[in-house]
Amino acid sequence: MRITLAAHCSCRVGGVEQYLATLVPSLLAAGHDVSCWFETAAGEHEPILAADAPVEAIVASEHRDPFGAARAWRPDVIFAHGLSDAAHERALLDVAPGVIFAHDYHGTCISGTKTIRAPRARCCERTFGPSCLVQYYPRHCGGWSPVTMVQLYGLQRARLGLLASYERIAVASRHMAEEYARHGFASKVRVVGLPIESPVAPAARDDGDGAWRLLYLGRLEFAKGADLALESAVRTAALMMRPVHLQISGAGSLDATLRARADHLTRVEPRLSVTFTGWLDQRKAAAAVDHSDLLLVPSRWPEPFGMVGVEAALRGVPSVAFAVGGIREWLIDDVTGRLVDADPPCVDAYAAAIAACLIDRRWLARVRQHCRESATRFQISSHLAALEPVLAESAYARLARTVA
């Protein structure tokens, strides 16, 4: 097949771009022709495409006629990934039949988090529509700007409308399949999983100074629960009466608040130490996982998948996570980590789950082995076996309708 991958950025600025960096060489190796269509470039980041990759790349922001160039390449199918401009989506769907990979809540939530904050934080299962505008402020679904709210609503409404024009909707989890089924797309949605592989072999474990080592790896935002990771760590130190070190790796709007709070908590509880590293590249993130006893995934929002937990599991590190979204499809409670009830997401319950993991060394050893075994399900070969039929049936669906 001739496959055009369409995405927002040509550089590795997030999980979507990292996925594409893994997918492109695999599609080429499988005998497909691949081109890429990007809305923009971010030159300070590592590019998705290797310098010697036999792939035509079109960057819309730098091209006089990006859609004409896409059409001239004559793709069999467009495989879209989170374009920021709905007009770009619409134009590309005129070029060839389309498959969209819904990496997030594309077209089904104003804020994109599917999380309400009032009267208490919990995941939202509403079907997107005008009533979301009524609920937005009372439920604290997002920010306080009415202009931004209306703009985001318009964007998501346009995206939802465009989903009907795609031949198929690919998702990483059954949770996301259910989300799009609720919005009327049950016949189009296909679960294809994600390819997750380790960049380097796991390093030998080093118990170091005897402190328990916890790792939070992600955006420092309310929806991701970065604050819950910090508050749970100090409670764990108090519960265990033993040194606990928490490494927080990431960036976001809570950065300054978390640093100030950590400074206070480490003075109150001297058995707690906290290190902030900012974002880590793939290899440094892998090294951080190797030096951790547990990965903390305290997300309040229903993670579409939560690939960070599988990345850690491949390296033999279990996760403690709230039972939300797609997390429940890779984290098996008491087998590859601990699931904590998320209604509501409670610091005390989360800290108790962390302590329960750490107090039993035999349990930890058993779970580490199960993590490695379970995570091997998410190989690129398995992903391609699920994805290729979806792309093929989409490529020929429009042709079949035309002939009929």
Residue ranges, per PLM feature:
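A conserved mid-protein helix/loop that constitutes part of the nucleotide-sugar donor-binding site
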Residues: 18, 22, 212, 219-235, ...
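Acidic donor-binding loop of glycosyltransferase active sites
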Residues: 290-304, 317
